[in-house]
Amino acid sequence: ALTIRALRTLAARAYATADGIGGGRKGVVHVNLPFRKPLEPIPVETDHADAIDDAGFDYAGAFTVMTGGATIPTVQQMQTLLALLERHERGIIVCGPKSLGENFVSAVAQLSQRTGYPIFADPTSDVRFGGHVQDTAVIGGYDTFLNAPPTWEAPDVVLRFGGVPTSNVLNSYLERIDVKHRVQVSADGVW
């Protein structure tokens, strides 16, 4: 039998997991609660209804505390990425849903300009439109040419930011190309 305290803790953990606290992916949480057949109350000698008042309802603090913080790459990770980008001229940047902060669009545009890598921008990425498209290679209509057999070499590097792109054509292309290096950057750490 679950105690009320255990149920509160379970509810707090389920909420924290669904909210992505602790660096996990935000999303649906499935909770299994064991019930006896036929899902109706059965009197048990050890049940004490008056004990419910002492079950912690007057306790205002949290039974379970989960926290999350900003994920910031280390200096070594940034140096490794920089060395990788300097070694390879052919690459693409894929921006999926859920941009990574208010400065992301300008930062990824600068990255594209410095590396020469075009940006394949998902419609939900916030990168497809804006002032940066005047001087940055932002490609939004990639579905029109990625389905055809490629007449170009596969990129050496694929930098992916955000969630999985919504385009099946782009996802199929990314799966079938032989890439030396794939780098995934996402706010929730999921790849």
How would you describe each model-predicted region?
Residues 1, 182-189:
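Short, acidic/small-residue loops that bind anionic groups at enzyme active sites
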Residues 5-11, 22, 97-103:
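Active-site glycine- and acidic-residue-rich loops that bind
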Residues 90:
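Hard-cation-handling environments
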Residues 10-13, 76-80, 141-145, 169:
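Well-ordered alpha-helical segments embedded in enzymatic catalytic cores
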Residues 13, 17-87:
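Conformationally flexible catalytic loops at phosphate/diphosphate-handling active centers
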Residues 33-39, 97-99, 125, 189:
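Glycine-rich beta-alpha junction loops
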Residues 95-183:
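Glycine-rich, anion-gripping cofactor-binding loops and their flanking helix/strand elements
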Residues 2-6, 67-70, 94-97, 157-160:
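Flexible, glycine/proline-enriched loop segments at strand-loop-helix junctions
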